Amino acid sequence: DIDLMMPRADYEAFKRVFPQALGEKYVLQAPNTPGCEISNTFMKIILRGTERLELQKLNAPGAHGLWLDVFPIDNAPASAAARAVRGFFIDALNYLAVSNCLRTFDSAALREYVSVNPAAKRNYRLRMALGALTAFLPYRALYNLFDRAAQMKKNTGWITVPTGIRHYAGEAHRASAYFPPSEWKFEGEMVL
């Protein structure tokens, strides 16, 4: 599992060129992408002909191989208060969307896994309840809604990775911390 990040404009452009450029060797799974299966609130690139299962998605449709996770870098409000408010709603929508998906593809293996840890079991029960409350919507619709809601057109000089491990507000930084990219050497080649 390798994680990458892309500015939103590049992320959207990559989704458009992917089928022709890489579609024979890889499978693309991404929200708001016609013809794609969706497995997360972010993009996955899966190597065709490989098999690797995620415990939370044993029953999910689509490819289950070795993958790269690609997280969009989105603009964020300049105001800390606005980032906190926006972050709360974006994170809540993400939690609801993932809960809906977990309930949709629930499995005995996942239930057994969480049963040994009281905190994990409580979180699982909460996610199943929230998944039931949102069951009238397909998980794909919630993933697409989250992806659209996380995008912010206005460039404020602040960015975030809404699907990052520290969530929306925790991943917020001044854009100058990431951009412009710097060149470095990888396996003997200079890359950005």
Task: Put a short name on every predicted segment.
Residues 12, 18-78, 98-192:
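Conserved catalytic core of two-metal-ion nucleotidyltransferases
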Residues 80-85:
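A short secondary-structure junction signal
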Residues 1-13, 188:
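Catalytic metal-binding acidic patch
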Residues 88-98:
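A contiguous, mid-domain pocket- or channel-lining segment that forms the substrate-recognition surface
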